[in-house]
Amino acid sequence: MKYCSSCGASVSHITPEGDNRPRYVCDACATIHYQNPRIIAGCIAEWQDKILLCRRAIEPRHGLWTLPAGFMENRETTLQGAMREAMEEANARVINTSLFCTFSIPHISQVYMMYRGELLQGYASP
């Protein structure tokens, strides 16, 4: 981060008074910019003992197989995000969902919340 999103001035990477770790702080307006982990919502969609996978169409890892998952949008629940990603990435409708697992990948600041459910009528498409 180089510039303040509040006023556009430059920022410094310092530990604010009363805090215990470095943050980006605006040199002009003193706004503290907190950078928090991103939440990834995804779905393990099952159909007749098979799992739905998607082939990645973009980087990173273009062409490799993955579960339908992605960044949450504002104003949606993690379940809504997981269902949206399944629909966007595989045109898949998933029912009877429940939270399957959560895990963190600290070095890239991501928290994953994966749901498990049934692929409706075994249908999905690119």
Where are the model-predicted features located?
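Conserved Nudix-box catalytic region and its N-terminal flanking loop in Nudix hydrolases
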Residues: 46-88
